[in-house]
C-alpha cells in the first residue's frame, strides 16, 4: 500500500535489503508453492520498487567511479547497510558511519539481485518484453559492479560481507574468483573463524563457504 500521500514523500525512503522484500518474499513464496497468484497480486508493487531502484541508480554519486558505470549502480541516499556486523566497528567517527561504509557494497549488490529476480518473475508471468528490459538493466548493473568497483580495487579490504554477497549473487568475475576466495578465507582466519558479516550477508555465508 502506498502511504506516501499520508506521511509525505520526504519521510519515505526505500533502503536496500529491507525494501527489496517486496520482490524477494513473493518470489520465494512462488518458488516454494509453485503458485503464481502471489506474483500476480504483488506485481504492481514489485514493479514500482524496481523502477525506483533503476531511477535512483541513475543519480550521480560522489564516488570515484566512471559515469558509464556509476549510472547503473544504486549507490545514493541513506541505507542501513550491515550495521549489525560484528567483524569490526565504525572507522569514520560519524553517526551511522558503519551504515555508510557497508552500504557502499550492499546497496548496488542488492539492487542488482532484485532486478535480476524481477527478470525471472516476468519470465514466469509471461511478460516477455518486461523480462527483456529488466534483464538488460540487470546485465548492465552486473557489468558496472565488476568494472566500476571490483576491477578498480574499490572493494572494502576488511569487511567480510562484501565478499560473501559478491559470491552469493554471482558477481565475481572468473579472473578474480581465486583472489576473492583467498580474501574471504583470510578474513575468516583473521577473525578466529568467527562470522563477521552483518544481517544482510549472514543468511548467505554458509552456502558461500560450502
Model-derived features with residue positions:
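Active-site core of glycosidic bond-cleaving carbohydrate-active enzymes
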Residues: 1-210
Amino acid at each position: 500500500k502506498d502511504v506516501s500521500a499520508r506521511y509525505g514523500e520526504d519521510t519515505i525512503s526505500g533502503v536496500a535489503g529491507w525494501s527489496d522484500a517486496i520482490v524477494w518474499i513473493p518470489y520465494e513464496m512462488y518458488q516454494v508453492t509453485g503458485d503464481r497468484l502471489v506474483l500476480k497480486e504483488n506485481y504492481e508493487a514489485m514493479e514500482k520498487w524496481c523502477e525506483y531502484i533503476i531511477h535512483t541508480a541513475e543519480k550521480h554519486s560522489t564516488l570515484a567511479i566512471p559515469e558509464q558505470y556509476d549510472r547503473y549502480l544504486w549507490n545514493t541516499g541513506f541505507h542501513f547497510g550491515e550495521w549489525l556486523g560484528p567483524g569490526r566497528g565504525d572507522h569514520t567517527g560519524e553517526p551511522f558511519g558503519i551504515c555508510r561504509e557497508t552500504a557502499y557494497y550492499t546497496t548496488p549488490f542488492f539492487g542488482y539481485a532484485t532486478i535480476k529476480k524481477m527478470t525471472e518473475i516476468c519470465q514466469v508471468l509471461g511478460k516477455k518484453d518486461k523480462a527483456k528490459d529488466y534483464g538488460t538493466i540487470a546485465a548492465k548493473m552486473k557489468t558496472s559492479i565488476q568494472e566500476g568497483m571490483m576491477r578498480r580495487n574499490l572493494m572494502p579490504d576488511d569487511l567480510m560481507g562484501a565478499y560473501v554477497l559478491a559470491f552469493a549473487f554471482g558477481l565475481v568475475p572468473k579472473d578474480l574468483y581465486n583472489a576473492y576466495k583467498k580474501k574471504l578465507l583470510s578474513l575468516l582466519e583473521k577473525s578466529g573463524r568467527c562470522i563477521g558479516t552483518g544481517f544482510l550477508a549472514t543468511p548467505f555465508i554458509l552456502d558461500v563457504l560450502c
